Amino acid sequence: MARVTVEDAVDRVGNRFDLILLASRRARQLANGKEPLVETKNEKPTVIALREIEQGLIDNERLDIEDQAAQKQQDAEELRAVDALRGIE
């Protein structure tokens, strides 16, 4: 079982509550198929997320930018699907 100390991650984020929110958000991304930014050794997404935060590779701003880009892509795909359906009518 991997042991992770969160003190360095807390120092980067500000407090434990914000760390929990950020780590869970990133762990969810990893569980859904996002590529990790650190080398992994068969670790769970939560451990990977904490390591990424601790190393300064992930923060709220980066996740916000990624989420906005993903939302724009999804919106564009939905608009293309609607346009394709309109062409059928």
Curated annotation (Swiss-Prot):
SMART domains found in the cross-reference section: RNA_pol_Rpb6 (SM01409)
Database matches in InterPro entries: DNA-dir_RNA_pol_omega, Pol_omega/Rpo6/RPB6, RPB6/omega-like_sf
Keyword Transcription: yes
GO biological process annotation, one example: DNA-templated transcription
GO CC annotations on file: DNA-directed RNA polymerase complex
Pfam families (UniProt xref): RNA_pol_Rpb6
EC code(s) of this entry: 2.7.7.6
Superkingdom, taxonomy of origin: Bacteria
SUPFAM superfamilies: RPB6/omega subunit-like (SSF63562)
Gene3D superfamilies recorded: 3.90.940.10
Keywords: DNA-directed RNA polymerase, Nucleotidyltransferase, Transcription, Transferase
Reaction catalysis annotation: RNA(n) + a ribonucleoside 5'-triphosphate = RNA(n+1) + diphosphate
Molecular functions (GO terms): DNA binding; DNA-directed RNA polymerase activity
Known function: Promotes RNA polymerase assembly. Latches the N- and C-terminal regions of the beta' subunit thereby facilitating its interaction with the beta and alpha subunits.
Subunit structure: The RNAP catalytic core consists of 2 alpha, 1 beta, 1 beta' and 1 omega subunit. When a sigma factor is associated with the core the holoenzyme is formed, which can initiate transcription.
Alphabetized NCBIfam families for the sequence: rpoZ
Family the UniProt entry places it in: Belongs to the RNA polymerase subunit omega family.
Record-given protein name: DNA-directed RNA polymerase subunit omega
Organism: Idiomarina loihiensis (strain ATCC BAA-735 / DSM 15497 / L2-TR)
Lineage: Bacteria, Pseudomonadati, Pseudomonadota, Gammaproteobacteria, Alteromonadales
Gene: rpoZ
